[in-house]
Regions:
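Terminal targeting segments of Actinobacterial cell-envelope proteins
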Residues: 1-16
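Conserved functional hotspot residues at active sites or interaction interfaces
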Residues: 21-25, 32-84, 144-189, 248-298, ...
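Post-signal-peptide, soluble extracytosolic/periplasmic N-terminal scaffold domains
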Residues: 43-44, 51-57, 76, 86-116, ...
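Intrinsically disordered, low-complexity Pro/Gly/Ser/Thr-rich segments with frequent PxxP/GP/PP motifs
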Residues: 49-52, 102-130, 134, 206-235, ...
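Hydrophobic, ordered structural segments
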Residues: 113-114, 118-158, 189, 223-261, ...
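Long, internal scaffold/assembly segments composed of regular secondary structure
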Residues: 216, 243, 274-344
Length: 500
C-alpha cells in the first residue's frame, strides 16, 4: 500500500508551484490537441502512455504530464436540478485543473485549484435549464481522477469519465416506451469537425436513417440526439452504434425511464469497443426483482454468448485451475440484433447476489449491459450498469467521489480467478492514505462475490480498494430524495496494477 507523506510548504513556494501548474495546464491543453491531430492512437494528454482499452473509464498510470477526463454530459433539458464534476486529488500537493464546459452556447473555461488530499466539486450547469453541458477536465499528472454527478427528481446518478476519445461507441440497452426519453450525447472536444454515422437497432432490426449519416459535429461542441425524435419512439429495445468517419468523439446516453416496467434515470458513457468477455458485479435475483443481461451483436456474423454466474454455491470443485460453474446459459445472438437474457430463468441460479461473466468461446466480440428492475414497497426502480472488460480486471480500484458512511451494500467485489483473495479498503484523508480498520482483511472466495456495508465512521474521501487477486468492483449509490432503490457504477480500475 502506498503511503502519501506530508511535507510543509512555504507560502512563497506554494505560489510558485501554482504558477507552474497553471502554465503546465495551458501547455497540456495545447498538447492534447497536437497529439490527437498527429497520431492515430486513441491517447490524449501530453506525455500520455499507451494503455490497453484506453477509452474505457480507468485510472491511468504515471508518468503523464497531464490527463484529460472526458465526462458523459449533463442533460439540463431533462429537468436536472444540479450537475457537477468531482475532482479527487490524493497527492500531497495542490493540483491545478482546467475545466471546459461544452454546450450549444459554445465553451466556457475556468481554472480550479484542488487542495492536497481532498475532493473539489465544480458546478457545470450554472443555472442552465435547457440543452446539454459536457465537462472536460484537464489535470496535471496521472493521479487525480474525475467523476460526474447529476441530481434529478427521478434519481441522482454518478457516472464515470474517461481519459480517451474513440472512433466507435456502442449502447446495448435503451427503452423509449410510454414516453421514456433517450438521448445520445456526442462530444467533439477537438478543433476540427468530426463526421459521425449513427445506427440503431430495435426489435424490428437495424436502421440507418439518412438523417443520422454524415452528422457534422462542430469543433469543441456537443450534439444531442433524442432517439424518439430520430425514429425510435415507443420502442422496447433500442441499441445504438456511433461511428466516426472523420475524427474521434465521446458518446454517452441519458435515459429517463417512465414505462415498460422501468422507472428512474441514468447517465453513462457508451462502450468504446466490442469485446469477447465482460464482467458484472451487481447480479441479484429474488422476489420482485427482474434481472436482465442485454446482449448486442453489431457484427455481420451470428455469435453464441455464454453467461456464467458466480458466487456462493455456484462453483463446484476446482480442477486444473478451472472452477466448474453450476449456473450457466448459452444464447445465440444473431448479427445486428439484441437479445435479452432473464437471469430468473437460468436453471440452477439461486436467489441472492452473484457475479456474471459473459463471453464467446471463439473470440467473437459483442456489447453487454446489465439491468435490474426491482419492486420495493409501492414503488420500483431501474439500475443499469455497463460491464468491466476482462482485461481490466485488476488488483487495485479507486472510487474518486467516495462512498457515504453507513451506506448498506456499498461495495461489491467479484473474484475473477479460481484462487481465494483478500481485499482491503483504504481512504484518502488530511494526512494521506490510511486504512479503514474494519475493512482490512475482507475474504473473497475463489470465483466468489463479497458485498460490504460502509462503516458509519468511514471517511467521505476517495477510496482505494486493493486485492491480492484480480477483481471487479462495483459501487452502490443512493438515488437521493428518499427514493427507493439504488444506482450502480463501476469503480475505476487502476492501470498498471496486476490486471490481466
Amino acid at each position: 500500500m502506498t503511503t502519501l507523506h506530508v511535507h510543509s510548504t512555504s507560502p512563497a513556494r506554494r505560489l510558485v508551484r501554482r504558477a507552474v501548474n497553471t502554465a503546465l495546464v495551458a501547455a497540456a491543453v495545447g498538447a492534447l490537441v497536437y497529439v490527437e491531430r498527429q497520431t492515430p492512437v486513441e491517447q490524449e494528454g501530453a506525455g500520455a502512455a499507451r494503455i490497453p482499452l484506453a477509452a474505457f473509464a480507468q485510472q491511468p498510470a504515471p508518468p503523464r504530464i497531464s490527463t484529460s477526463w472526458f465526462c458523459p454530459g449533463v442533460a439540463a433539458g431533462d429537468g436536472l436540478s444540479a450537475g457537477r464534476v468531482v475532482i479527487a486529488n490524493p497527492t500531497e500537493a495542490e493540483v491545478t485543473a482546467a475545466v471546459t464546459l461544452l454546450s450549444a452556447d459554445g465553451q466556457e473555461q475556468r481554472q480550479v485549484l484542488v487542495p492536497a488530499r481532498t475532493q473539489k466539486s465544480v458546478d457545470v450547469l450554472n443555472g442552465r435549464t435547457v440543452g446539454v453541458v459536457v465537462p472536460i477536465v484537464e489535470v496535471i499528472g496521472a493521479l487525480a481522477s474525475v467523476e460526474q454527478q447529476s441530481e434529478f427528481a427521478a434519481g441522482d446518478v454518478t457516472a464515470s469519465c474517461t481519459t480517451a476519445t474513440s472512433s466507435t461507441w456502442y449502447f446495448a440497452d435503451g427503452v423509449t416506451l410510454d414516453g421514456s426519453s433517450m438521448r445520445i450525447m456526442i462530444t467533439n472536444p477537438f478543433p476540427e469537425t468530426a463526421v459521425v454515422d449513427v445506427a440503431f437497432t430495435t426489435v424490428d432490426g437495424r436502421r440507418r436513417p439518412t438523417s443520422l449519416q454524415g452528422l457534422l459535429i462542430a469543433p469543441r461542441s456537443v450534439r444531442s440526439l433524442s432517439m424518439p425524435d430520430e425514429g425510435a419512439a415507443d420502442e422496447q429495445r433500442v441499441a445504438v452504434e456511433v461511428k466516426t468517419t472523420t475524427g474521434k468523439v465521446v458518446a454517452a446516453r441519458a435515459q429517463h425511464y417512465l414505462g415498460g416496467g422501468r422507472l428512474g434515470y441514468s447517465t453513462m458513457l457508451g462502450v468504446p469497443q466490442r469485446l469477447s468477455k465482460w464482467w458484472f458485479a451487481g447480479g441479484n435475483t429474488g422476489a420482485n426483482i427482474v434481472e436482465q443481461l442485454v446482449l448486442f451483436n453489431p457484427a455481420e456474423d451470428d455469435i453464441t454468448v455464454d453467461a456464467v454466474f458466480t458466487g456462493a454455491g455456484l462453483s463446484g470443485d476446482v480442477a486444473n485451475g478451472v472452477a466448474a460453474p453450476s449456473a450457466t446459459t448459452s444464447v445465440a445472438v444473431p448479427a445486428g440484433e439484441v437479445v435479452v437474457v432473464n437471469a430468473g430463468n437460468v436453471e440452477g441460479l439461486p436467489e441472492g447476489v452473484h457475479g456474471i461473466s459473459v463471453s464467446t468461446k471463439d473470440g467473437s466480440t459483442f456489447v453487454a449491459e446489465h439491468v435490474i428492475n426491482q419492486r420495493v414497497a409501492k414503488s420500483n426502480f431501474t439500475a443499469v450498469m455497463t460491464g468491466a472488460p476482462d482485461e481490466l480486471a485488476t488488483t487495485t480500484w479507486r472510487v474518486p467521489s467516495g462512498v457515504t458512511p453507513g451506506t448498506p451494500r456499498a461495495l461489491t467485489f467479484v473474484n475473477t480467478t479460481v484462487f481465494d483473495a483478500t481485499v482491503r479498503v483504504s481512504a484518502i484523508g488530511p494526512g494521506g492514505e490510511f486504512p479503514i480498520p474494519s475493512l482490512q482483511t475482507i475474504p473473497l472466495p475463489a470465483s466468489g462475490v463479497t458485498v460490504i456495508d460502509m462503516p458509519l465512521d468511514a471517511t467521505t474521501g476517495e477510496l482505494i480498494i486493493e486485492s491480492d487477486q484480480p477483481i471487479v468492483v462495483q459501487r452502490r449509490l443512493s438515488r437521493g430524495r428518499q427514493l427507493v432503490g439504488f444506482s450502480g457504477v463501476l469503480a475505476l480500475p487502476q492501470t498498471g496494477a496486476n490486471s490481466r
